[in-house]
Structures are given as C-alpha cells and as structure tokens.
Regions:
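Gly-rich Lys/Arg/Thr-decorated short loops/hinges at beta-loop-alpha junctions or inter-strand turns
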Residues: 1-3, 110-115, 319-325
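Charged, amphipathic alpha-helical linker segments immediately N-terminal to NTP-binding catalytic cores
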Residues: 79-141
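Catalytic cores of large soluble enzymes that bind and process phosphate-bearing ligands
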Residues: 6-14, 119-127, 327-334
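Short alpha-helical segments and helix-capping/turn motifs at coil-helix boundaries
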Residues: 15-24, 68-72, 102-103, 251-263, ...
Length: 359
C-alpha cells in the first residue's frame, strides 16, 4: 500500500467501529436499499458488488453505474455472495474523537475484506471511486492494468484510450464523433486479451453544458438519469447548467444504453493509440505531440495538468498540478506499478502514444 495524503492508515479497531456505525445507521433508517451489480464488462474478470444505502438517489446511482445483472444472474450468482460491499451512511456525520479520523467525513476501505464504508458525505461519486480503488489494488496482481481513461472503438475495429484527470475531456471527446463508439468514459482495464470498461454507466460533468456542443450528454438527462449538485431556473424549472453556487462539480449519471453510439458489451481489442489529455493552462506543453516510450513513461508518472472541478480535484479557478497516472488520488499502489505495466503493454502491442493539450 502506498501511504500518502490520499491513503491514510487507520487502526483495525477504528475501522471496525466506523463500519459498525454505518451498519447500525442503515439498519435503523426508515429505508434501506440494496443494489447488486457487476463491475467489469469482461466476464472473465468481472466482480460482484453489493451496495447498502439509505438514499434512493444513491441506489439509483449505483444501478446506473454498475452493470445490471439479469434476474437469473441475481438468483444464481449473487446468492452465492459478493466480492465487494459498500456501506453508504453518508447522511451520518462522523466524530473526530475516533482515533485516526481527521475530518467530519470518512471513506474507510478494508482491503482484506473488500469493504468500503462512507460517512459524512452524500457525494455519489464516492461509491464508484470506491469500487475503482479496490480494483486498482487487486487487478494488477492479475496483470490487469487499470487506467483513469475513456475508451472508444472506430469503424475499423481499432480502439483508442484517452487518459486524463476529471474535466480534461475524457467524456466529451469520447462522445464527440459519430464515427467512433464509446466503450467507457472514465475507468478502463487493459488485460492480455484487450480492454474493457469497469462501469455500466457514465458520470459526466454538466457545468456549462450546451445542447449543440454535447448533444449526447444533454439528451441522456432524462427519466432514469441523475443530476447532482445542480440548481433549477425558478420559472421554467429547467436545469441551470451555468450555476456554480453549489459547486463547479455538477454532474449527471446515466446508464450506457442511454447513448445511441455505444459499444455493448463494453469491451474491445488492444488499443492502437493512447492519448494523454493535459489541461495545460500555462502554455508550457504543445497542442499535440507524439511521445516515445521514455516520454510516455515520464508524462504518465508526472501527470502534469491543471486542477479543474471534478471527482478527484476541485478548484474554483484552474491551477497547475501534478497527479501521477492522471489520477493519483485513486491509486492504492505506488504509481510506478501502473507506469511499468503501461509501458510493457505499449511495447508489446506497438501502441502509439500522444499528448493532447486541452487547456
């Protein structure tokens, strides 16, 4: 485990107490919802996830973001147990008197038992990133590389990965072309057989959303989708996409099948191109550059970009930052573990690597 400002150790007694507080809160709430779903579209590597929560919108969020099992799979597969459990008691504040707790909210991860507990925050993105972090710990042991990236498939059957922090363009660029099908917009795995999307849905930023520029996202905001951290125009009751009074990190969650140009099941062959999306607001990097293996290794490890409001980093104004692997906050292992795997796969499959500056 790579301990740092994002991965903070806590003693087993405190972790057990935090989990018990969440379980007790859920058990004594008026409503308790349980959502079962798969993470990972490749059936050889998918895992079963079970979420316990008290808010309907959290349940719908996980129903959107996980891969929905069939009735037969629910009966025959999930009845045998699950691989990951999430206890979301986000409405309950946590006491700083518990040893190891440093804030009034906590996301506590028990890797040995694959359980995540959430207290003190109702941000739905915590659940999907909990699954991502657990898989980023276990998948590399199976030689599966986890990437904070979107993935697309073109008409010729070749795939492209776009790695980047939140708000650098992974979702927007992945959905922009009618000639490319979206495989996933945020969490991609690269195996010995090809690539697959971890998620069953999209979690897209909607700040300043324009129907003419991003029609796919706009048209996916309908019955069954979720809009989070947004306000409404008082007269028309339509969404005010330009309001940042709550946070710039306003988002929508919807299942992949809401998109007309999606590749389902969300799997594909080994990528032909990998694009590092860098929102360089200082003008240091060129608009486009092709990288050799050493440059790709350095750029992936340094993760130079700008802080933009998102699930991993939030800021009211852009500022330069470095985030290893374009998602350091999600990495349980040392960044070189993922960087070494990436370069090995790039060399093995003769992949082109590009840097694109979206700043």
């Amino acid at each position: 485990m790579n301990w740092n400002n994002h991965n903070i150790p806590i003693d087993p007694e405190s972790a057990s107490l935090i989990e018990q507080l969440a379980v007790d809160y859920i058990n004594h709430s008026e409503h308790c919802m349980v959502v079962d779903g798969y993470a990972g579209w490749d059936k050889n590597y998918r895992v079963k996830v079970r979420t316990f929560c008290t808010r309907t919108y959290h349940a719908l969020f996980m129903r959107n973001m996980l891969i929905r099992p069939t009735e037969k799979e629910l009966e025959e597969d999930f009845s045998k147990g699950v691989d990951i459990q999430i206890f979301n008691a986000g409405e309950m504040n946590i006491s700083k008197n518990i040893p190891g707790v440093t804030a009034n909210m906590v996301t506590a991860l028990n890797l040995s038992q694959r359980r995540m507990t959430i207290l003190g925050t109702q941000f739905a993105g915590e659940m999907k990133k909990s699954v991502f972090k657990i898989l980023q710990y276990y998948y590399p042991r199976k030689n599966i590389l986890t990437l904070h990236s979107s993935a697309t498939l073109n008409e010729n059957g070749t795939t492209t990965l776009m790695c980047g922090l939140s708000a650098t363009g992974k979702t927007a660029l992945g959905l922009r072309s009618d000639k490319r099908k979206i495989i996933g917009d945020d969490e991609t795995c690269w195996t010995n057989d090809g690539i697959f999307n971890i998620e069953g849905g999209c979690y897209a930023k909607i700040i300043d959303l324009d129907r003419t520029i991003e029609p796919e996202i706009f048209n996916s905001i309908r019955y069954g989708s979720i809009v989070e951290n947004a306000s409404f125009h008082p007269d028309s009751r339509s969404i005010n996409f330009n309001d940042v009074s709550i946070t710039p990190n306003s988002r929508t969650s919807f299942p992949l099948n809401f998109l007309k140009n999606v590749n389902l099941p969300a799997v594909g062959p080994h990528p032909k191109n990998i694009i590092f999306l860098t929102c360089d607001t200082k003008g240091v990097l060129p608009p486009v550059a092709k990288l050799n293996h050493d440059q790709a290794y350095y750029q992936f490890l340094s993760g130079y970009t700008a802080k933009i409001g998102g699930t991993d980093l939030s800021a009211s104004t852009p500022s330069s930052t470095f985030s290893s692997c374009f998602g350091e906050i999600f990495l349980p292992l040392h960044p070189t573990v993922y960087a070494n795997m990436l370069i090995e796969k790039i060399k093995k499959h003769n992949v082109n690597v590009w840097l694109v500056n979206t700043g």
